[in-house]
Amino acid sequence: MLDTNKVYEISNHANGLYAATYLSLDDSGVSLMNKNDDDIDDYNLKWFLFPIDDDQYIITSYAANNCKVWNVNNDKINVSTYSSTNSIQKWQIKANGSSYVIQSDNGKVLTAGTGQALGLIRLTDESSNNPNQQWNLTSVQTIQLPQKPIIDTKLKDYPKYSPTGNIDNGTSPQLMGWTLVPCIMVNDPNIDKNTQIKTTPYYILKKYQYWQRAVGSNVALRPHEKKSYTYEWGTEIDQKTTIINTLGFQINIDSGMKFDIPEVGGGTDEIKTQLNEELKIEYSHETKIMEKYQEQSEIDNPTDQSMNSIGFLTITSLELYRYNGSEIRIMQIQTSDNDTYNVTSYPNHQQALLLLTNHSYEEVEEITNIPKSTLKKLKKYYF
């Protein structure tokens, strides 16, 4: 894989001319120019190679044409706004000795014109050892990228009551996933595109997780009392105005990702494998988007003592940061999955429950002084 923090110039191996485009013109063509031409600007020559899934790249104009990217137009190369899932904007860059072959997703390769067509670039069928199809990628600038931090691999357990009946409201956030997202895939209305690629070619997407007390789950029970209660889970955030329009995917009710092309352009569909692997978020198998939900539950106190009960949910927080040497958070969405709901109580009878896994009721009754009838109810309820 080519370096992801480099700005490149792309020149033809046969004629030494450079791939260039014009400033301020939408859908302008990519042609070959002499580096010393009077009407050429340094930015016309600079390209950023954003890696995507399947070892392909999006070739992006660096600070020219508002981050326009290469796309195919009748076997010619134009630049246009990036659009997720647009196959004509995807390129494979294959090493060929000291140079590279640049192949479109349609199978044809970048070929320099000859003779009267010397300044043209076209897509043609690949031919062996054709110098007009060989390209030099010269690094002309290095971009500072953030260092990947240490990622936690296991979430801490949810809080439990202390022997005196105290309990925390939750646990501290743990960084469980981290990845870089190309700026062309991010809708950031607070920065213009030309500034964006020069200062923030990559955004940082983080996944934090932690336990938090579920709203409505705190229940006090008298001896031998049974109660119904309602707790909340899901998300209160309008996903359309946050993650969908910012990154081009949504979180569905099963906490999985569903990718789509956002109305504002961009989108991360082309790096969904990367997001799946580095953020540890599965693809959704549901059609219903995550919203705020209320869940009915019931708890029973089978003992002769008063009991308190509290439920905890795993909170997943996805946070997007603009990075230009320091981090500025521009998006956050927090969700909780009902499948993570866990209940703890006081007194929690933890010792008795553990003993019941490998001791008889009579043995546990003798050790804990909890009546056999109560132990049976505890086992029925908690197991």
From Swiss-Prot:
Do the record's keywords include Magnesium? no
PTM comment: the record says: Proteolytic processing occurs near the C-terminus yielding a stable protein of approximately 40 kDa; this may be the active form of the protein.
Is Cell membrane one of the keywords UniProt gives this record? no
Keywords, in A-Z order: Sporulation, Toxin, Virulence
- What Gene Ontology terms for biological process does this UniProt record contain? sporulation resulting in formation of a cellular spore
Q: Name one Pfam family in it.
A: Toxin_10
Q: Which family does it belong to?
A: Belongs to the toxin_10 family.
Annotated function: Component of a binary insecticidal toxin active on western corn rootworm (WCR, Diabrotica virgifera subsp. virgifera Le Conte) and probably also on northern corn rootworm (D.barberi). Both proteins are required for maximal toxicity. The larval midgut epithelium is probably the primary target. This protein alone has no activity against southern corn rootworm (Diabrotica undecimpunctata howardi Barber), but it synergizes the toxic effect of its Cry34Ab1 partner. The 2 proteins individually and together form ion channels; channels made in the presence of the 2 proteins have higher conductance.
Summary of subunit composition and partner proteins: Monomer in solution. Copurifies from parasporal inclusion bodies with Cry34Ab1.
The name of this protein is: Insecticidal crystal protein Cry35Ab1
Q: Which organism is it from?
A: Bacillus thuringiensis
